[in-house]
């Protein structure tokens, strides 16, 4: 199974890319993970709907066919690390690749939210885009460490 973080946005600072790379390289082989940056649509005189439609097409092109669709959304499930680990375990049992979508400045097309297999919320706080990417990568690694009984995660 592969975990693909698909993030609409511009190039991130080195600390974001290096942090994500560090957590992703720690992932076990059976859970290969990657971050793919999706170029945002140039604003110009386009409406929000036009921007999101163009980005939707780019996201679809980057997704592996048949992937479980997980949307990061402010109204998504607010999970603890242990609950995320259980969710990840369920995804692993399903066997499909997982596409985790992080929308751009204007969010994600509503169709993604409606078709999502899961909707997750990283925080009630508004996070900078790069921080959301890094936090997601770290939490995916932490969830795996819980499942593997690795000492990275200490409970209580």
From Swiss-Prot:
One of its GO terms (cellular component) is cytoplasm. It catalyses: pseudouridine(1915) in 23S rRNA + S-adenosyl-L-methionine = N(3)-methylpseudouridine(1915) in 23S rRNA + S-adenosyl-L-homocysteine + H(+). One of its GO terms (molecular function) is rRNA (pseudouridine-N3-)-methyltransferase activity. S-adenosyl-L-methionine binds at residues 72, 103, 122-127. The keyword Chloroplast does not apply. It comes from the Bacteria. Keywords: Cytoplasm, Methyltransferase, rRNA processing, S-adenosyl-L-methionine, Transferase. It is found in: Cytoplasm. Pfam families: SPOUT_MTase. Its EC number is 2.1.1.177. It is an enzyme of class 2 (transferase). The keyword Methyltransferase applies. Specifically methylates the pseudouridine at position 1915 (m3Psi1915) in 23S rRNA. Homodimer. Belongs to the RNA methyltransferase RlmH family. This is Ribosomal RNA large subunit methyltransferase H. It comes from Dechloromonas aromatica (strain RCB).
